[in-house]
Amino acid sequence: MNKTFIFDYDDTLAWNQHDYSYAQLEFLRWIIFEKLWPNAPDLQYIINLEVEIDNKNVETMGFSMERFPTSFQQTYKSICKEKNINYNEEDLKKAYEIGMLAFDKKRWKKLGLVEGAKETLDYLVEKEKDELILLTKGDLKIQEKKIKTTDCQKWFGKEIYMVPQKDASVINNVVGNRDKSRVWHVGNSVRSDVSPALEAGIKMIYIPCETWAYERKHEEVPKNPRLITFQKIIEIKNKYNSLI
């Protein structure tokens, strides 16, 4: 009997976290060397403040595209107020623009899928005739553009689901009446992939990857007989016969 694989997208099939890191590095450079030199705070202070503000904004703005650049604006305003430095609307506009670098379509195209992803997806579809489902969390507009840019629809067809939050109920809705003993979720986040998949009663392939601070709040990997940890996505192909 064929298997069903429910794949996460960000940092499972395609790189994501480093897009945000790229924007953060440019933000640090702009603040320290262009705007506030020689009165700029320590680099670590700036990044810690930005992460703290961004984590708080998740509670009110969720995973919308606007949250990340808005956090840059708020970080810059906070630093300026603390240092008694004036700022203007042009500064805030620039901070927002830097935050938007995390959503650069050209970078998505350049980076493409993670190493081994295409080979693995081809194998599952062409060789094993398995069913593939894509379940991704985030801003609908951004996720649609990412998936289109990396041409993922050729493997997943219409079985592509984009949700604002991923939990056990969402996974159960996607699984439907399928035999859960034949369903595997594949993802990189303990919080957004491992925990909800195990709670939903399906099997889990965990592929660790660097995640952002909000996801790391719940990073302890649970012990469960339905959980397998691979280091690279290609191991799904190479160790396929062990997935029982």
What are these regions (language model features)?
Residues 1-3, 118, 122, 138-244:
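Asp-based, Mg2+/Mn2+-dependent phosphohydrolase catalytic module
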Residues 1-48:
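Active-site neighborhood of HAD-like aspartate-dependent phosphohydrolases
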Residues 20-29, 69, 73, 77, ...:
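An amphipathic alpha-helix signature
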Residues 20-21, 39, 43, 62-69, ...:
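Alpha-helix N-cap/helix-initiation sites
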Residues 33-50, 81-96, 154-159:
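Short, surface-exposed acidic
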Residues 51-105:
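A metal-dependent, Asp-based hydrolase signature
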Residues 90-150, 161-162:
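Substrate-recognition element of Asp-dependent hydrolases with the DxDx(T/V) motif
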